[in-house]
Amino acid sequence: MEHNFKWKNDGRTKIMIGCGTRPEIIRLAAVIKRCREYFDCCVVYYNQNWDRNLSTVFWEDFELKNTFGEYGPDILVPVVGENLGVTCGNILGRSYELLSELQPEGYLVLGDTNSCLSAISAKRLHSPLFHMEAGNRCKDECLPEETNRRIVDVISDVNMCYSEFARKYLADTGVPKERTYQTGSPMAEVLHMNLEKIQKSDVLERLGLEKDKYILLSAHREENIDSEKNFLSLFTAINALAEKYDMPILYSCHPRSKHRLEKSGFQLDPRVRVNEPLGFNDYNKLQMNALAIVSDSGTLPEESSFYLSIGHPIAAVCIRTSTERPEALEAGDFILAGITTRELLNATDMAIEMKQKGVLGKPCPDYVDETVSMKVVRIIQGYVNVVNKMVWRKY
């Protein structure tokens, strides 16, 4: 595979980070910076999210520069094929080729995307494998991520989970407890790192919106978009929400979601404004000023907890029927709404009224720790040699 990356060979541990989607860039932002500070680091991007608004803009938002001094990863790997099988095959084949060539001393992945399946290549090549966001479970087999989670959890040498719930799920699968660590979520560190930029964003002025006079919408998950039944149920509910509140609903719309809407011919209420995907700082500024946030994003519970911790609660409504973040539900940081009209209207009414009355949950401790990147690099540094010696018997 053609690329220009070379290790610095400065004596530091050689760590490769594999990612392929917008959420991974966001969650790994502080960790990537910390790894570049303490390791000889190579960031590989498998380009699942190929649209500029879902990839390039985020490297810029977080000022993540590669070894060549440019915003972006060190190595960009095209993997998207004509179907899921080809894409996953490309991820496995091309990650195997890169790992074979560069031979990092450790490989780090986060989460549950198809790009995380590159972990299989690292395992087969005896590269110590570290997994952030390990142990997340929503117990819903309709989510493709649930399969990826189990695969990567079980084969990883060291699992780093967000919460005690996740640690328990890992233990239930038989993953060694002695190589499982609870680090907390990296999102608070990322949000704090960008809070000043978020607050300075002029996105409301650019979009002609006013504080508390719009609802922010994000709907992109496969189970909501690709299922005909769920798609119709959800967007019928969104139209009902627009009619009830009679204000703009700003839809940060992914390309595949937009394509699905166009292909279906579904007529959105005129008050639902379909917008291109927004950058991190703009989107969070919109979250901080919206009357309510209606989203199927996995980061919503963590963002809600963070904003609650800094005295700026948001009305967070999750348009899903399951969650892999029960600790945030337990803390009262968001409402799990479902995707029917009745469920969505009731949940949104409740979230808005509770916020206005100051009836709030409490910040989830796992979601407000701003030292996660430090923990991650220390764990990696400590276990690279242990895994090479005890698991792979390299010396």
Annotate the PLM regions.
Residues 108-110, 116-119, 131-132, 159, ...:
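A donor-sugar binding/catalytic signature common to diverse glycosyltransferases
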Residues 48-51, 56, 199-289, 394:
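Donor-nucleotide binding loops and adjacent catalytic segments primarily
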Residues 10, 98-105, 209-210, 289:
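Glycine-rich phosphate-binding loop signature in dinucleotide/nucleotide-binding domains
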Residues 353-395:
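C-terminal amphipathic helix plus adjacent low-complexity
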Residues 41-49:
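A short beta-strand-loop structural module common to alpha/beta enzyme folds
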Residues 14-19, 24-34, 38, 58, ...:
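Active-site and donor-binding regions of nucleotide-sugar-utilizing enzymes
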Residues 2, 48-53, 78-79, 152-229, ...:
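A nucleotide-sugar donor-handling region in carbohydrate enzymes
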